[in-house]
Amino acid sequence: NLVQLGKMIFQETGKNPATSYGL
């Protein structure tokens, strides 16, 4: 789900997950 995806993105990029979604 989006929550798990967001956590993965945060761990991989070290950025705020919201920025990866363009939010």
Swiss-Prot record:
GO terms for biological process: lipid catabolic process. Its cofactor is Ca(2+). It catalyses: a 1,2-diacyl-sn-glycero-3-phosphocholine + H2O = a 1-acyl-sn-glycero-3-phosphocholine + a fatty acid + H(+). This is Basic phospholipase A2 CTs-G6. Keywords: Calcium, Disulfide bond, Hydrolase, Lipid degradation, Lipid metabolism, Metal-binding, Secreted, Toxin. It is an enzyme of class 3 (hydrolase). One of its GO terms (cellular component) is extracellular region. Snake venom phospholipase A2 (PLA2) that induces local edema a few hours after injection (5-10 ug) in the hind paw. PLA2 catalyzes the calcium-dependent hydrolysis of the 2-acyl groups in 3-sn-phosphoglycerides. It comes from the Eukaryota. Binds 1 Ca(2+) ion. Belongs to the phospholipase A2 family. Group II subfamily. Its EC number is 3.1.1.4. Contains 7 disulfide bonds. One of its GO terms (molecular function) is toxin activity. It is found in: Secreted. The keyword Hydrolase applies. Expressed by the venom gland.
